[in-house]
Amino acid sequence: MDEYQSGLESLFARRQEMSHKDSGNPDVIISEQRHVMITQLSFFTSETAKMTKFLSSLGLSALPSYSQFKSGKNIAVARVEMEKIWLIGQLKSTAKAYKFYPLDLSSARNIIRLSGTRADDVMARLCAVDFRDNTRNFFATSIHHVGVHVHKQKDAYEIYIPRSFGETIAEYILDISSQYH
């Protein structure tokens, strides 16, 4: 099988060259998360108990609330809609997942990781979401008029971008983050 090729590779290589002039820890660190498996599962409200049981078989404690992201040992789950979740990580078998209408989104998304001391400032410029809200950690929003999902972590953000807009959004993020170097 061919090695995964990213359309963002040259952008991030250029960014890395620019950051070599910085000494110490840069204010904004941008990287691409690669080889991440994303499987979307859909279920009806009446199937919530079945979904919860399925997730527990994967080692996940519960079905997260809307706009929540929970991590297990080898897999994570994000509640993207009331009746849709994303499993992020390698599924050992999709046999049990078939009843939840699995859809492989792995090659449909670029994932950009944004961290550093000024990452909060960059995100504030990118989208109109108050990321200080501690009750949610997974947001559906838009950047540059493109629908994206953002996973807010303790010290970083992961931005899930439709692949067809990956390069445009990455350029936009690089432009904004360059103000903080």
Predicted regions located by residue number:
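Basic, glycine/lysine-rich polyanion-binding surfaces/domains
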Residues: M1-H181
